[in-house]
Amino acid sequence: MNPTITSNRNPRIVEARKLDQRKHRQQQGRFAAEGLQLLHMALDSGARTLEVFFCEALFVGDEAPALLARFRQTDAEIFAVSPDVLRALSERESPQGLVAIFSLIEKSIDSLAMTGGELLIVLDRPQDPGNLGTILRTADAAGASAVICITPCVDPFDPKTVRSSMGSLFNLPIIQTADVTSLFAHLDGFKIIGADAKHGEIWTRCDWRNGVALVLGNEARGLSDDVSSYVTSWASLPMSGKAESLNVAIAGGILMYAWVEANLTR
């Protein structure tokens, strides 16, 4: 068993703490995650665990020890750390005693086995990590088959995205691509429905049956011209109040569940 790590200057701790930066996640090919439920979901998904840091002094109840036992059944390296070191690794105000490091999960559009009846979420260069995490969580709940991010975009493995996804990041294929033309060529046969507050059919009147690629715009600029050119119909969410717009994650959730309702009997 490895000795307890008590210094934040330990090389493993130094490298793990760098994972809050995108460039280091990409260089190392890995990312950090925490939260007991989220980590259970990661293990259930088969995500490859590289390292686990734990501090028994911060465990509360039986769930953390049970989770640690699950990690011991993997090929991950397991390290006991002091409370101060665990707190330095954690993004949470009240750490639950476990932080795990996983391999980055990379998927391509070619890896999707699609029948044409799926719901796909296409995000046009999203920039807010919290919004992306919420969209991932909602897409997972709605039964979407994948979330596709047109780049440049926020990193899906940003700590805020990982946390706000509540583990759904491990359940859904997340595809990143800059090739808009190739992307929409792969979506031939899908209805390409764009969300727009100002024009198009009221969302309840749109045809959400069968295969739909729901396209959501950038938080500040909406849908870009190059992406808009592929949209075959528009869904609007009319607003009766004084707000200028809906949060993209909220709007996306409403539209995802329009697809769910339309396909309940399939």
Regions found by a protein language model. Give the residues of each.
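Amphipathic alpha-helical repeat scaffolds
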Residues: 35, 128-134, 246-251
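Active-site/ligand-binding-proximal alpha/beta "capping" segment
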Residues: 193-243, 247
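Short, ordered loop/turn segments at secondary-structure junctions
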Residues: 57, 151-154, 220
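RNA substrate-binding interface of SAM-dependent RNA methyltransferases
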Residues: 44, 70-73, 79, 84, ...
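N-terminal positively charged helical leader segments and presequences
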Residues: 1-93, 189
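Glycine/charged-rich beta-loop-alpha catalytic/anionic-binding loops adjacent to active sites
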Residues: 22, 113-121, 230-239
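Structured adenosyl-cofactor binding patch, chiefly the S-adenosyl-L-methionine
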Residues: 138-142, 153-169, 225-266
